[in-house]
């Protein structure tokens, strides 16, 4: 789930650049800590949820969360929207991660961290390149989802699509980081940017995990 960030959205009181990026880091850390707690405590519960009900609730929650984050003028409502992304993704991770061994999870975790750091550094060096990627990345992601749905329907192995997804989400991290630098610095926009980066990083982590586990 990705979105194009409106960098002209001037909502709320402007904060300093340092405070803005500290807020982004704080919200990202909050989301990942909540996810880790859910994985550690809700694994058995998550695996016994009816899959149809879970998927419906997952997509509804993520959709409402995205709408709240993007459309509201209230930072508190944006934070509620952020939680509507973090919590269902936490349940998804709690259900999925027990199927992988700890070695693969650790590899995916550290690799994701290194890629994230690398993309932030590169996007700081070449921001103009990443500013031009928005439409291309969005279209590429939509095409990837379409191809994967078709492959799933016909039972085609999708291993190579994980590599394409890794490239897309890695570039999205750089793109969203540049958007954060260009955006109006406010509490509401820090939640918006944290949500975008959170989705990029989680998706990248899961794709790397799939690649690593399939190689074992």
Q: For the regions a protein language model found, what residue spans apply to each?
A:
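A hydrophobic alpha-helical transmembrane-helix feature that marks the membrane cores
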Residues: 1-216
